Every structure is written in C-alpha cells, then in structure tokens.
UniProtKB/Swiss-Prot annotation:
This is Cone-rod homeobox protein. Transcription factor that binds and transactivates the sequence 5'-TAATC[CA]-3' which is found upstream of several photoreceptor-specific genes, including the opsin genes. Acts synergistically with other transcription factors, such as NRL, RORB and RAX, to regulate photoreceptor cell-specific gene transcription. Essential for the maintenance of mammalian photoreceptors. It comes from Bos taurus (Bovine). The lineage of its organism: Eukaryota, Metazoa, Chordata, Craniata, Vertebrata. GO terms for biological process: cell differentiation; nervous system development; positive regulation of transcription by RNA polymerase II; regulation of DNA-templated transcription; regulation of transcription by RNA polymerase II; visual perception. Belongs to the paired homeobox family. SMART domains: HOX. The gene is CRX. Residues 247-258 have a biased composition (Polar residues). It comes from the Eukaryota. Its main location: nucleus.
C-alpha cells in the first residue's frame, strides 16, 4: 500500500527527464502563490510609565543622541527605533502648539496682515508713493510748445512721453523756463530758422518764380547768389567783399532783388586790374602784366 502511495523515480521518455528543472509540471492556467504582502506595522500603545520616561528625557533635550535613546528604550522595554519615532512626532507636535499660541495672542487684524493674499502681478496699479521720481524731469503727459512774448517762433522744449521716439529734454523746469524766457535772443542768432507757411512752397507753380518767397526759410543759411549790379566788385581773395555780412536780418536778405547777371559783369573780366588784385610783388616773376619780367629757370 505504501509502495502505491509513493511512486518510484520518473523514467525518461526519449532521453528527456520529466523531473528536470526546466519542466513545468503544473498547468499554465494554475498560478503560483504570490509573495506574502508586507503587513503594516502595528501601532505602539505607550503606557503611563513609558510616557513619563519619554517626557522626562524630552524635557531635558528634544534631540537626544543614540546612547540616550537606547538607555530609555531599555528602561521602558521598547526598541530604540520606536523611541526615535516618538521623539520625532513629539517635536512636530511641539511646533504645532507654538504656532497656535502665536495666532491666539495676535489680534484679528494682525493675523490678516501676517499672511496677505497673493495678488497677481500687474492687476493693481501702483500708488503715487511707489512711483520713483524721474531724475531727468520727463513727464508722461504731452504739453504743447509755449508761445513767445513777441509772437515769433521760440525754442520752447515740449515734454513728450518716455516711450516716444521723439527727442527728450533732460533739462529741469528751471532751465526750461530760462530757455523760454530767452526766446527772442535765440531767434536773433544767425542759425535760427524762420519757418514759412506751406503755401509759400507748394501753393502754385508761380511761387517758384519768386526767389524771395521760395528761399524765405533758408535766408539765414544762404547768402545771395549775385549782388546788385551797382554793388562793389567781387574779389576772389578779399574777404569783406565776398558777400553781405552775416549779421544782416533775414528780411533784408529776402527783400533783395535777384537780377540776371553775366559772369563778365560780375567779375569784370574786362578790367583785370580792378578785379583780380593778387597780393603779389610787382617784381615777382609770376606777374603777368609785364611780360619782360617773365623769368624762366634753366633745368
């Protein structure tokens, strides 16, 4: 009977052993038992005597070293790891109690200020006290140019926006007022341009026939092309006779008549002695008036 219950060794079939390590004797539908699930550690329940020992050590130090923990663990008959976890939880509980006491001592208004609501950037405008003053004196608002006292165009500086590509004035208000007050003196300078109305430039083709109306805005920069016929003769080397003085007013320059002229009349080629007066010595060998004075150097 026992021989029937305990079969003999397996015989090989076609030289293959059925009990080898590579032979699966179980049906594939039958699964193997899985590894046992790790059970959760049980909660430790401390007795009154254990808590008294732990609280006594916690009153001495909140961070005991490993030797102090092992000593207490031997007294209360607990592993050292449980004592370490108890101290960790006790420190967290102590911090929580301190925060609650601070919140109870503070008034309700102080609690709201201690933890303000987080606002998004750019939602609320800045107050006037937060805005830094502009060191250059440039304001964000545009102001038109101030008129001068005599009605003439002045060099008043207009403040523009800081984002404008136009030129900005780095001058303070005091210097700006000084520039406005000295407007007439600036307009009398030879480089101040008087702007003519647009109708004087492009109203009709007849406007181009009058040089005074066409060049009225450029008179301070342009000297008259041709002096009057009765004026003094031009000399290429004489400074004062080149043209009228720059100190003349634009109205006097624009009022001059530009007549037709001939290079022969203006430069007076007919009389070379009166026009082409070179500052040369009469005995100079380059004097062309006396051909007998011509001298040639032999090379």
């Amino acid at each position: 009977m026992m021989a029937y219950m305990n079969p003999g060794p397996h015989y090989s079939v076609n030289a293959l052993a059925l009990s080898g390590p590579s032979v699966d004797l179980m049906h594939p539908a039958v699964s193997y038992p899985s590894a046992p699930r790790k059970q959760r550690r049980e909660r430790t329940t401390f007795t009154r005597s254990q808590l008294e020992e732990l609280e006594a050590l916690f009153a001495k130090t909140q961070y005991p070293d490993v030797y102090a923990r092992e000593e207490v663990a031997l007294k209360i008959n607990l592993p050292e790891s449980r004592v370490q976890v108890w101290f960790k939880n006790r420190r967290a509980k102590c911090r929580q109690q301190r925060q609650q006491q601070k919140q109870q001592q503070q008034p309700p208004g102080a609690q709201a200020k201690a933890r303000p609501a987080k606002r998004k950037a750019g939602t609320s405008p800045r107050s006037s006290t937060d805005v830094c003053p502009d060191p250059l004196g440039i304001s964000d608002s545009y102001s038109p140019p101030l008129p001068g006292p005599s009605g003439s165009p002045t060099t008043a500086v207009a403040t523009v926006s800081i984002w404008s590509p136009a030129s900005e004035s780095p001058l303070p208000e005091a210097q700006r007022a000084g520039l406005v007050a000295s407007g007439p003196s600036l307009t009398s300078a030879p480089y101040a341009m008087t702007y003519a109305p647009a109708s004087a430039f492009c109203s009709s083709p007849s406007a181009y026939g009058s040089p005074s109306s066409y060049f009225s805005g450029l008179d301070p920069y342009l000297s008259p092309m041709v002096p009057p016929l009765g004026g003094p003769a031009l000399s290429p080397l004489s400074g004062p006779s080149v043209g009228p003085s720059l100190t003349q007013s634009p109205t006097s320059l624009s009022g001059q008549s530009y007549g037709t002229y001939s290079p022969v009349d203006s430069l007076e080629f007919k009389d070379p002695t009166g026009t082409w007066k070179f500052t040369y010595n009469p005995m100079d060998p380059l004097d062309y008036k006396d051909q007998s004075a011509w001298k040639f150097q032999i090379l």
